[in-house]
């Protein structure tokens, strides 16, 4: 029987399409601006995700000795610096394709997208829970 849940690839594509729609609206991108913006931003996102994957979760700190904690702190700040460097590089590249006002709105678009996505995920979880409860009552 086919699952009602989309696979991770389909889910990623839907999230990407939702990001494009929200950013395009919030930043008020023209077709020409969007054509220049998205390739730059997508590369930035991939690089940023790669940096974030390198960071060890802090919930492992209790099992570390002092030297490992010191190394964790050092690596954590190196990764944060790398993220900052990526963001600076992004802004330099975006200056060639977007006006400053739209670049300045990018953090707003990112925040609103994240908040909206989290809310959509919560709503979907609640709907699934309600369906399960409803299905259980019919048995």
Regions found by a protein language model. Name each.
Residues 3-5:
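Boundary of Sec targeting at the N-terminus
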């Amino acid at each position: 029987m086919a699952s009602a849940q989309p696979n991770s690839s389909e889910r990623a594509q839907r999230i990407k399409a939702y990001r494009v729609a929200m950013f395009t609206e919030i930043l008020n991108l023209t077709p020409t601006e969007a054509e220049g913006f998205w390739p730059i931003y997508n590369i930035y996102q991939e690089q940023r995700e790669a940096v974030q994957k390198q960071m060890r979760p802090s919930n492992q700190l209790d099992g570390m000795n002092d030297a490992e904690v010191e190394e964790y702190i050092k690596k954590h700040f190196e990764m944060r610096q790398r993220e900052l460097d990526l963001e600076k590089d992004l802004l330099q590249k975006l200056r060639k394709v977007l006006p400053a006002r739209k670049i300045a709105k990018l953090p707003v678009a990112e925040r609103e997208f994240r908040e909206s996505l989290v809310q959509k995920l919560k709503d979907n979880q609640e709907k699934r829970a309600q369906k399960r409860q409803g299905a259980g009552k019919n048995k």
